[in-house]
Regions:
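Acidic, metal-coordinating catalytic segment for phosphate/diphosphate chemistry
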Residues: 1-21
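A generic structural micro-feature
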Residues: 13-15, 43, 90-96, 113-116
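Conserved hydrophobic "DFG−1" position in protein kinase catalytic cores
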Residues: 23-24, 32, 102, 121
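Conserved Nudix-box catalytic region and its N-terminal flanking loop in Nudix hydrolases
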Residues: 25-67
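A short coil-to-beta-strand element that immediately follows conserved catalytic motifs
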Residues: 72-81
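Active-site-adjacent beta-strand/loop module that shapes the phosphate/pyrophosphate-binding cleft
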Residues: 80-108
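NUDIX/MutT-family hydrolases
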Residues: 110-141
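Charged phosphate-binding loop/patch that engages nucleotide di/tri-phosphates or the phosphate backbone
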Residues: 137-157
Length: 157
């Protein structure tokens, strides 16, 4: 929070909203991009980014997936939210990341675009959490794994 002693104005440094997509390929793998830019250049990241003014979280995620990997996805299912910090140009921004799960509709045009060095399909169990760019994403991976494991247990009953 920033305070102006002259006029008593308070500026609350509230979180901005980010989105990330657990995009599946139909055989259980997740879509990951290797970041081409800082912060966390070279680390794995889910397709996603910041919500623009006037967008819903769902609209932002669909836009980011198109911009980053040229992919359309089916219906989005909310997974979880996680607090995060984004360090950029000397400033640490508080972020609230919203994570969704969706299936890829057609992967024929899939390729790395804006800010993405390369794309990879990786099974959730094969992920090295230390290779993932942001703490919020690592925590969301755990939620995804636990949710899928719980779903598998209930389907077998």
């Amino acid at each position: 929070m920033l305070h102006c002693a002259g006029c008593d104005f308070l500026l609350h440094f509230n979180p901005t909203v980010g989105v990330g997509g657990f995009v599946t390929d139909g055989v259980g793998r997740l879509l990951w991009g290797r970041r081409a830019k800082h912060p966390a250049r070279g680390k794995l990241a889910l397709p996603g980014g910041f919500v623009d003014f006037g967008e819903t979280a769902e609209e932002a995620l669909r836009r980011e997936i198109r911009e980053e990997v040229n992919l359309a996805v089916g219906p989005l299912q909310f997974l979880c939210s996680q607090p995060n910090e984004y360090f950029y140009h000397g400033i640490t921004y508080p972020v609230l990341d919203l994570f969704f799960v969706a299936s890829a509709l057609d992967i024929t045009g899939l390729h790395a675009l804006d800010g993405v060095e390369s794309v990879h399909w990786i099974a959730p169990g094969d992920l090295d959490l230390d290779d993932i760019a942001f703490p919020s994403v690592r925590r969301a991976v755990e939620v995804f794994r636990n949710t899928r494991a719980a779903g598998a247990r209930t389907e077998g009953r």
